[in-house]
Curated annotation (Swiss-Prot):
Pfam family name, one: Ribosomal_L25p
HAMAP family, A to Z: Ribosomal_bL25
Keyword Ribosomal protein (UniProt): yes
MF terms in GO: 5S rRNA binding; structural constituent of ribosome
Organism: Klebsiella pneumoniae subsp. pneumoniae (strain ATCC 700721 / MGH 78578)
Keywords: Ribonucleoprotein, Ribosomal protein, RNA-binding, rRNA-binding
Gene Ontology biological-process annotations: translation
Protein name: Large ribosomal subunit protein bL25
Length: 94
């Protein structure tokens, strides 16, 4: 079971996303179900080490957003074209 700590994004847009990536974080979103979508930011290195395992893409993950747990599955992952970097992840509520 994977547990990911996240923070709610305070800023959105291209400039804010670039600042996140420069700070070794990256944007993500949680959507689906009855609740509203939540834009979050994740620590790149922690998630990078988790995504090396195949179970990351098939199991239900726990994302802790401001102390509240969300059960999610990975819907889509975007990677940098040639650097070993994640640029965005979509999570869907399980």
């Amino acid at each position: 079971m994977f547990t990911i700590n996240a923070e709610v994004r305070k800023e959105q847009g291209k400039g804010a996303s670039r600042r996140l990536r420069a700070a070794n974080k990256f944007p993500a979103i949680i959507y689906g179900g009855a609740a509203a979508p939540v834009a979050i930011e994740l620590d790149h290195d922690k998630v990078w080490n988790m995504q090396d395992k195949a179970e990351f893409y098939s199991e239900v993950l726990t994302v802790v957003v401001d102390g509240k747990e969300e059960k999610v599955k990975v819907q889509a992952v975007q990677r940098h074209a040639f650097k070993p970097k994640l640029t965005h992840i979509d999570f869907v509520r399980a």
